[in-house]
Amino acid sequence: MIPMNDLSRLSVAETEGTFESFRDIVMSGNYILGVNVEAFEKNLASFLDVENAIAVASGTDALLISLRSLGVGAGDVVATVPNAGGYAMTAIRQIGAFPIFIDCLADGQMSADDLFSVVGHSPKIKAVVMTHLYGLIGEAERVAEICSEAGIFLVEDCAQAIGARTDNGLAGSFGDISTFSFYPTKNLGAIGDAGAIATKDKTIAERAKSLRQYGWSSKYEVSESMGANSRMDELQASVLNRRILEIDQINQRRREIWCLFNQALSGSSEVRIIGENGPRFVAHLGVLVTPKGARTQIQELFRDRGISTGIHYPVLDFDQKGFEVGLHRPCPVAENLTSRLLTIPLFPTLTDEEVREICGALSAIKI
């Protein structure tokens, strides 16, 4: 069975480098927020062309701390899409804020037109969380412009889109603050949980840095309320310091595979794969949009050919039983997409033979 991902497919150099780093870190006796973390923060800030990067324990923590750093709290309204897996919602509800949902475009990204409409007619929105879903950067520049004109903070959730870029900058450089996940399956993945925050604003960065460690300004001196214990460890940072040097090549390999999948679908007018061939897309996931009612049939075709599939994501946030959804409004595009999405394997260590087998399955879709 071709898996959705296989994290064990490491090169000899990668494996040896990780073991060597692990040995050095163990011997150093410095395991949390040490020299490797400091180096990674500098490397990430340089890559994004922003002034500040703050390493944290996970992408979800990055969202939570970012919202708190902007002063978002209980009773505030935060705009987000309902189709991005619930990660932004988790952070929004954890700080006591309420979501207002913005519909998406046909590729799953936040609709700037719908955001503009909501900003003009809805209760005061304090922040927008824009998730760059599937590896696309979406309408980041227009969303940033809408937020700036309305005096609304913009949080870019770049968990799936590190390295995606427009002519004017990278994902993570348009908002007031941006968040990253380095969960192992991400384009830039660690070997455990890890995340980061990036911002051009020094004051916001100082708040985020304090909030990641209890709200301390110095050891045992609390200057910010609602602090967390969210620190990146040295091993994760050492892995990320190596892998960030290769992120553009990793993203290019992902795009090359996506292009082959897209070409394999050229004979089908009813099935498409989300993405585009260019720097605005880093091919985090291979997401098909299937005809209404045909997803199960196509899923079975892949299963019969020994190819794993998934759904990103099967339940919209406002349909989740565990969320208090707050200001619910219709999101017809998101609702239509959710029942039609099917994810196929797309990761950089797919073998050429596996890519051919997946392309064969795509070419065999007859709807």
Segment roles from a protein language model:
Residues 95, 149-150, 305:
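Helix C-cap/helix->beta junction micro-motif
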Residues 83-89:
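Conserved coil-to-alpha-helix start sites within the AMP-binding
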Residues 80, 97-107, 310:
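Short beta-strand->loop structural element characteristic of the AMP-binding/adenylate-forming
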Residues 107-190, 196-198, 343:
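Active-site phosphate-binding strand-loop segment of PLP-dependent enzymes
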Residues 7, 37-42, 50-53, 113, ...:
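PLP-dependent aminotransferase class I/II
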